[in-house]
Each structure stands twice: as structure tokens, then as C-alpha cells.
């Protein structure tokens, strides 16, 4: 019995004894950690990988994987992916996988590799991540639903998307996206859970597979439906930690779901992410428009750009073809016109999303309508809004960059 070993398997480019060993390593390099979205061979997660000859002339792939933490909920997924990848190597007739966990030193080394310093990656020179803060003047206008569905729309185009649920007192993003996993901790570094855009629907309306949404929310750190009673300084520190201590990796888009109004979080966001573009959500109702205008004009003080207005809960088309204007009409266009006048630059109406029961039920079930019913008129409107937000001629925005730095 002979062995074809990979030596120094915690290095990115290990020494090898044979082409079979090289092929096994290359196959393992196609396996990504589901949260970090990086090859396990780059993350020091492969402790052993060897091809051992058997009496029948075949080879068994003997692999040991180190998970980042004990009791990792993604253990089964990673193990299955490793087995599948190793079994594709020509000459391998059997695969055996041992699963362990990193020790403290290995986790510390991984943390240093992922984020050597506690810095803000979204304001760093050369950052190509577009940052959008989704805001509203008042609650109940569907701001969080729009945030979740915009993220789904971006991901369906093959983009890497992150969401910070900054509505600390009224967090809801994990539920709207069906995210139940808790974040992974590497010392003081937080790895957010991710949800993939459905592959079978990734091609809808010109999209591409491979997109995903990473989510962080204060709700992931609480038991049950526990309320949060925090004031300004605590709210600022929470947002700061989400920005500085959460490892999102390379993102094309970062969305923030802000609480309604112009309070502490809105001010903290402008200080921590001055490059964030504001997207206002309002219903057509004129009372909602008046409040939303105040949220938009705050940008004069924070020196941030308002990229547009989304009118949510617009006219619903009934089975007989008539339109039901539950919340009136024209509010979104009126808001865009008012802000254009006050801010002295064009603020477009990005789109009018109709009142749709499926949007609500999809949120309750944790499946955004953009994924659950991608060919519906509502999904088409949200996709069109996402396309308008991505359009910026002078940048690379909207292109999946996938840079691992």
C-alpha cells in the first residue's frame, strides 16, 4: 500500500509527491466554505489530503477537514462537498473524510488572514462596494420588504450582496430572507450567515447563478423574540461593530435597512458610511410623503446622495382589470419632485411596486417574491428598480467582482 501525500496542507500552495496528489488538492480547491465563500484550501481547513492505494488497484482519498468552530451547523454541507469534489478525481475509487475543528491558534491565524486590522472596508481607498441605505420617514411602508427583495434582485444577477439590519429595535431582515443560522465567531471576528440565490431561477430576466446575500442582525444574538431597549450610544456601537467586526468578504452591494425617521442610527450611519447612497421608500399616501421628505432632506446635513424614491403599495390590479388605489396615487412622483427641488439635483422615481399579497406571504415564509415568483409583475418592477440603482456609467458597479483580498 502506497500513499500520495500533500505536505504542508495548511499552506495555499502545498508541496506534492505526485500528479494524483496535485489533482486531489485542485479538486478540494473547488470546495468553498459556505459562509466565507473562499476555497477551503486557502483557509487552512484541509489538515490532511492523501491518496492511498488499495489492493484492487484503486486509490482512496483520505481527507481531514478542520471546521472553524466545534459544532459548526454547516458540517454536513462541507463534508458532502468535499466527498463530491474528491470523487471527481480520476483514479480515486473511494473517499473517506474525517472532520475536526480548528484549535485556538488556527482560528486566530484565520482571523488575521481574513481581516488583519479592525478597519472599515467600505470606506477604504479603492473599495468598489456600492452602499445603499434604505430609509423611510415612517414605519409600515414596506421598507424592510423592499430591502430584502432588492438584495434578492441583486443576488439573482450573480452579485455578492450584504445586508446590515440596522433597524435594531424593529429587526426583521433574517425572517424576510429565511435566515435561521447564527453567525460564526472567530475570536472577535463575526462571520455572517449567507443565503444563495436559487440557481434554477438565477437566469430569470437576464440574471446569472452564483449570487448570494450575507446577513447580520441584532436578532441573531437574542433569544426568542426578546426586545432591545437601547439608547443612542449603544445603537452607535452596534452599528459600528456590524461594520468593523463583521467579515462580509468582497461585496458588490451592501444594503442597510435603517429604522424609520431621522434618529440616532441615521446619524451614526452617515458618520460611519458617508459614501452610502440613500433610497427612500414611501407609500403613495400624501401623509407618508410628507414624513419621507423630511428623511430625504436630512441628506443636506449628512452630505449624502439620495439615489431615488421607491413608491411601495401602489395600485393593485383586481381580477376584473380595475385598479384599486388603497393608499392613493402619485405620492412617489410627488416625493421625487419635492426632493429634486430641495436638494437641487434630480432625484428619480425608481419605480412603483404594486400592493401584492404574494409579496407579504413571501416575506412571512422567508422567500422574497423576487425568488419565489420571479415572473410576477411585482418582481419585474423590483428587478427594474435594482437595475436602475446599479446603473452608473463611471464605475464597475453591477459587475460581480469576486475579489478576495
Language model features with spans:
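Conserved catalytic-core segment of NTP-binding enzymes
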Residues: 245-248, 252-352, 357-361
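Residue-level signature of catalytic and energy-coupling elements of molecular machines
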Residues: 28, 46, 72, 86, ...
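N-proximal, solvent-exposed amphipathic alpha-helical segments enriched in charged/polar residues
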Residues: 2-47
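Walker A/P-loop phosphate-binding motif and the immediately C-terminal alpha-helix
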Residues: 130-169, 296
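C-terminal boundary of histidine-terminating zinc-finger modules
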Residues: 365-378
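Phosphate-binding loop that captures ATP/GTP phosphates
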Residues: 154-230, 236-237, 243
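Extreme N-terminal, non-catalytic leader segments
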Residues: 42-55, 61, 68, 75-136, ...
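Short, hydrophobic beta-strand segments
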Residues: 2-12, 59-69, 132-134, 277-278
Amino acid at each position: 500500500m502506497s500513499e500520495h501525500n500533500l505536505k504542508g496542507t495548511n499552506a495555499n500552495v502545498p508541496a506534492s509527491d505526485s500528479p494524483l496528489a496535485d489533482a486531489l488538492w485542485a479538486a478540494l480547491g473547488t470546495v468553498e466554505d459556505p459562509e466565507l465563500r473562499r476555497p477551503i484550501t486557502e483557509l487552512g481547513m484541509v489538515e490532511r489530503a492523501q491518496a492511498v492505494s488499495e489492493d484492487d488497484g484503486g486509490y482512496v482519498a483520505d481527507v481531514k477537514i478542520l471546521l472553524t468552530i466545534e459544532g459548526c451547523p454547516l458540517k454536513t454541507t462541507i463534508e458532502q462537498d468535499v466527498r463530491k469534489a474528491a470523487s471527481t478525481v480520476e483514479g480515486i475509487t473511494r473517499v473517506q473524510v474525517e472532520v475536526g475543528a480548528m484549535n485556538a491558534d488556527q482560528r486566530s491565524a484565520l482571523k488575521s488572514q481574513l481581516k488583519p486590522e479592525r478597519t472599515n472596508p467600505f470606506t477604504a481607498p479603492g473599495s468598489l462596494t456600492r452602499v445603499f441605505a434604505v430609509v423611510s420617514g415612517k414605519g409600515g411602508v414596506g421598507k424592510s420588504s423592499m430591502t430584502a427583495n432588492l438584495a434578492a434582485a441583486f443576488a439573482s444577477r450573480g452579485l455578492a450582496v450584504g445586508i446590515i439590519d440596522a433597524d435594531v429595535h424593529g429587526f426583521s431582515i433574517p425572517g424576510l430572507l429565511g435566515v435561521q443560522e447564527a453567525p460564526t465567531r472567530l475570536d472577535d471576528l463575526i462571520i455572517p450567515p449567507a443565503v444563495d440565490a436559487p440557481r434554477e431561477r438565477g437566469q430569470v430576466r437576464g440574471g446569472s447563478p452564483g449570487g448570494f446575500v450575507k446577513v447580520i442582525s441584532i436578532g441573531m444574538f437574542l433569544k426568542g423574540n426578546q426586545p432591545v431597549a437601547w439608547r443612542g450610544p449603544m445603537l452607535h456601537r452596534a452599528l459600528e461593530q456590524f461594520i468593523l467586526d463583521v467579515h462580509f468578504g468582497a461585496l458588490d452591494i451592501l444594503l442597510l435597512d435603517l429604522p424609520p425617521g431621522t434618529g440616532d442610527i441615521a446619524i451614526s450611519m452617515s458618520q460611519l458610511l458617508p459614501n452610502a447612497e440613500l433610497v427612500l421608500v414611501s407609500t403613495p399616501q400624501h401623509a407618508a410623503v410628507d414624513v419621507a421628505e423630511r428623511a430625504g432632506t436630512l441628506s443636506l446635513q449628512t452630505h449624502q446622495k439620495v439615489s431615488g424614491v421607491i413608491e411601495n403599495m401602489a395600485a393593485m390590479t383586481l381580477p376584473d382589470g380595475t385598479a384599486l388605489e388603497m393608499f392613493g396615487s402619485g405620492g412617489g412622483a410627488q416625493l421625487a419632485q419635492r426632493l429634486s427641488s430641495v436638494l437641487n439635483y434630480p432625484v428619480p422615481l425608481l419605480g412603483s411596486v404594486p400592493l401584492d399579497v404574494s409579496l407579504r406571504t413571501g416575506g412571512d415564509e422567508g422567500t422574497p417574491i423576487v425568488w419565489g415568483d420571479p415572473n410576477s409583475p411585482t418582481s419585474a418592477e423590483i428587478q427594474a428598480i435594482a437595475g436602475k440603482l446599479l446603473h452608473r456609467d463611471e464605475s464597475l458597479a453591477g459587475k460581480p467582482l469576486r475579489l478576495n483580498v
